[in-house]
Amino acid sequence: NRIMTEATRKKIVMWFWILFTTPIVLVIGLLASVWAFADIPSFEELENPDSKLATEVISSDGEILTTFHIENRSFVTYEELSEHLVNAAIATEDSRFYKHSGIDFESLARVLVKTLLAGDSSQGGGSTITQQLAKTLYPRETVNSKFKMVWIKLKEWITAVKRERNYTKEEIMNMYMNQIFFGSNAYGIKAASQTFFGKNPVDLTVEEAATLVGMVNKPTRYNPAINPDKSLTRRNFVISRMEQNGFLTKAECDSIQQIPITLSYQIQDHNAGIAPYFRDMLRRTMMAKEPK
């Protein structure tokens, strides 16, 4: 009886601590989750991101005289994108773009197997275009622990799924193209098109679109004005991916890969454009303090 009594007492103590600590652990976990995900943007914030768009000075006939900006970024609509840009981005960055809902588990599994078992890292990180767009909301420069990185990755996944539920694929692609940094003070595809080729995104050829898309993940390494040889190799890789994904025929691929990269390179700044005296006077007027 004494042994039974002692065993019963231990069970009572054990269940007491379980019942006592479980709510505390749950509350702590809930508070930690609220803290960890507190900065996940709302739908309104996703709808109206702080993109630091440039102020464009436009003449009466519709010509852009100059821009004033912190980041050289101008918005374009989906209809203003060359189809070659969209095709190149899908072929290179997210071949299953129209088949997943923000996270492509099939691609993640493939990348994991090839990276760990075959040692092949050429498949990239398995991030979808929607995930890459979400990454711009969570800077990683100051992250110095694996634990924080896991939290950030989880928040990126949640944000990516949230975007997929609220936007069409075309809207997501448009956001992506407007958000990418291409180096050379070019933020977004419009600034990049004008900086490197002196034209609007809708007018880009296949080889020009492939050059810009090739810069997405490493804008300095594959900058055609800085590293023309590396840029050409990368551009031709993008073109080959377009052929593999059915956007180009084999003959088109082989022909386009022979075309050299021809730039119309000009970094866009406040001094670029026509009517310099008018622009300077306008800048002074805009920056002048309102009299008290």
Language-model segments: residues:
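Generic detector of well-ordered alpha-helical segments enriched in charged/polar residues
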Residues: E44-E47, G62, A109, V113, ...
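Generic surface-pattern signal
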Residues: F37, N48, L117-A118, P139, ...
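N-terminal type II signal-anchor transmembrane helix
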Residues: R2-I58, R96, L116
